[in-house]
Amino acid sequence: PMEQVAEYCRDYEAKIAQCGGIDIQLLGIGRTGHIGFNEPGSDHTTHTRMITLDTVTRIDAASDFFGAENVPRRAITMGVGTILEARKIIILAFGENKSVIIARTVEGDVTPAIPATYLQKHPNTDVLLDAAAAAALTRTRLPWLVSNVQWEPSIIRRAIIWLSEKMSK
């Protein structure tokens, strides 16, 4: 029942504490940058609570619910603060449709607009990606800007094109 949700959320947090905290937090990431169901605007201090799902999140979940009209409008989620208390965090992302949000999460500023960016502040986070999800990262697109590269013909060609465009040549 709705009137018991707040109590349930408090009890859930208490059980986590009683068990000594979370050792490993395994997360996916939504197109909006949500982790769990911590939608854009979520604060880094939040704990388990009921939230209203973002329209994009509901659309993305539609196939799991046999249509968008069947996707719940609200969900209970572990808060960002609770997630950040885990000793180890692993975030997984696969597919080209995750590449832009992964780049913003890993390389962008920490912001409540993209809750996954809070993971930058965690001392023990791994981001595991396939090549498609990593495609928009600087280290994939322009590796010569961030590390030493083995200058093979394809990379030389990409670097020359990039530099020519940058110099308007």
List each language-model region with its residue ranges.
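Conserved phosphate- and dinucleotide-binding cores of soluble alpha/beta proteins
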Residues: 1-168
